[in-house]
Amino acid sequence: MGTKVILGIIGAIVLIAIVLGLSVVGPYNTLVRLDQAVQAQWAQVENVYQRRADLVPNLVETVKGASNFEKDTLTAVTEARAKVGQVTPGAMQNIVNDPATFQRFQQAQDGLSSALSRLMVVAERYPELKATQNFRDLQVQLEGTENRIAVERMRFNESAQAFNTQRESFPTVFIAGFFGQKFQPKVYFKAQTGAEKAPAVKF
């Protein structure tokens, strides 16, 4: 076999190796970028949820000042906030890859949303409470925070969907499978059950 033939074979092998390498590096880097985007958006979700949790103690103390305010409603808010504290993942970086933990997190947050919604509806029955500046300020802050939560959840779902779509595309799906736990499918927020219905309040 001549030298030119050998060099030609070696060149072909090198070229194939380069092509295969590029076909892996590109999708891998895309997955890394999209995964980082999901993690960054999740941090924003945690921030707005924490902001809401921080408002609850002041809100509860303010509402306590209203005479004969429903104790059950206050208790429900306090207990819901406590449950949020029990399941908030904090330093757990893989919650977006863990459907069970993510579901517990969402259920706790949705429970607090429902409790706060009921509290605000009940507060309409107490004109003296609504007249206080502190309550009005907290109400505005809470409403703003709830809006931010909705926006950040939507953005998180969009980033998770972008990752999952890319992950399932060819040939990325094989690369994701090869790296196993590193590129697990991302979970989504689901609409809160009964969110389309106003909370029922007995008068």
Question: Over which residues does each language-model region extend?
Answer:
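A helix-centric hydrophobic-segment signal that preferentially recognizes long
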Residues: 1-203
